[in-house]
């Protein structure tokens, strides 16, 4: 009589975590950071149709890396949650903290009970009426939540990108200077390719800002002109 195959709970959770991390690492990194104008989200994204950065509600933005169909389902669920809560109570009752807790429940349940964990990493940010009230929440594949201060990098070679970005970024920077620091950080080659010279296409950025100067719906997408420093007075 053959013995039943046994996997310890510790090994099962470790395998699930490794599976999710590998899926997330294949995605291009996203940087979320504060600046004087608000909270900026940015990533490299060559697709014009599939967004990794989106609006959830008046003062709340969403960014994710990993499997697109999974984080898109989270985004849609977040919008429905926010709309229902804002309609049932008051628009001011819709907060990033409550949304992060709802996402944590979904991610945690999938990690422990579903056939496979969700291959996603999520950031939810809420713009405060002043910089001291800005809130940034980082959610991992297992449902764990961390409140970040100032900036966070998810996906890709996040350790290298985070180190490069923090070396040149300050929370009191302008939007233009913050975007310059972001592009420098995102242009870092992955560690495994650092010793190889590769010809790559020019990066295409997806970026958005929760704009503190806007009274209600603060989310606005940034264009390529926002990434180009002003060149007034340089005619030849």
UniProtKB/Swiss-Prot annotation:
Complexes and interactors: The 20S proteasome core is composed of 14 alpha and 14 beta subunits that assemble into four stacked heptameric rings, resulting in a barrel-shaped structure. The two inner rings, each composed of seven catalytic beta subunits, are sandwiched by two outer rings, each composed of seven alpha subunits. The catalytic chamber with the active sites is on the inside of the barrel. Has a gated structure, the ends of the cylinder being occluded by the N-termini of the alpha-subunits. Is capped by the proteasome-associated ATPase, ARC.
PROSITE patterns to which the protein is assigned, alphabetical: PROTEASOME_ALPHA_2
GO cellular component: cytoplasm; proteasome core complex, alpha-subunit complex
Organism encoding this protein: Jonesia denitrificans (strain ATCC 14870 / DSM 20603 / BCRC 15368 / CIP 55.134 / JCM 11481 / NBRC 15587 / NCTC 10816 / Prevot 55134)
Locations listed in the record: Cytoplasm
Gene3D superfamilies for the chain: Glutamine Phosphoribosylpyrophosphate, subunit 1, domain 1 (3.60.20.10)
Control of this protein's activity: The formation of the proteasomal ATPase ARC-20S proteasome complex, likely via the docking of the C-termini of ARC into the intersubunit pockets in the alpha-rings, may trigger opening of the gate for substrate entry. Interconversion between the open-gate and close-gate conformations leads to a dynamic regulation of the 20S proteasome proteolysis activity.
UniProt keyword annotations, A-Z: Cytoplasm, Proteasome
GO molecular function, one term: threonine-type endopeptidase activity
Domain of life, source organism: Bacteria
GO biological process entries: modification-dependent protein catabolic process; proteasomal protein catabolic process
Pathway: Protein degradation; proteasomal Pup-dependent pathway
Function: Component of the proteasome core, a large protease complex with broad specificity involved in protein degradation.
InterPro entries hit by this protein: Ntn_hydrolases_N, Proteasome_alpha-type, Proteasome_asu_bac, Proteasome_sua/b
The family this protein is said to belong to: Belongs to the peptidase T1A family.
Protein known as: Proteasome subunit alpha
Pfam families tied to this protein: Proteasome
Cytoplasm as UniProt keyword: yes
């Amino acid at each position: 009589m053959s013995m039943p195959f046994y996997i310890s709970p510790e090994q099962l959770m470790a395998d699930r975590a490794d599976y999710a991390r590998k899926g997330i690492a294949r995605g291009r990194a996203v940087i979320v950071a504060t600046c004087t104008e608000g909270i900026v989200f940015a990533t490299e994204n060559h697709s014009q149709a599939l967004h990794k950065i989106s609006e959830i509600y008046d003062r709340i933005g969403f960014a994710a890396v990993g499997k697109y169909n999974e984080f898109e389902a989270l985004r849609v669920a977040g919008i429905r949650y926010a709309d229902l809560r804002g309609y049932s109570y008051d628009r001011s009752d819709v907060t990033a903290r409550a949304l992060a807790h709802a996402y944590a429940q979904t991610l945690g349940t999938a990690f422990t009970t579903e056939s496979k964990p969700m291959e996603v990493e999520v950031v939810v940010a809420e713009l405060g009426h002043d910089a001291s009230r800005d809130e940034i929440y980082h959610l991992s594949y297992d449902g764990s939540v961390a409140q970040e201060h100032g900036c966070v990098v998810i996906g890709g070679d996040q350790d290298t990108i985070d180190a490069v970005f923090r070396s040149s970024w300050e929370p009191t920077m302008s939007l233009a200077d913050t975007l310059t620091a972001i592009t420098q950080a995102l242009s870092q080659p992955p560690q495994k390719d650092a010793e190889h010279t590769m010809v790559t296409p020019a990066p295409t950025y997806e970026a958005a800002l929760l704009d503190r100067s806007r009274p209600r719906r603060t989310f606005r997408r940034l264009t390529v002109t926002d990434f180009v420093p002003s060149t007034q007075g340089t005619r030849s």
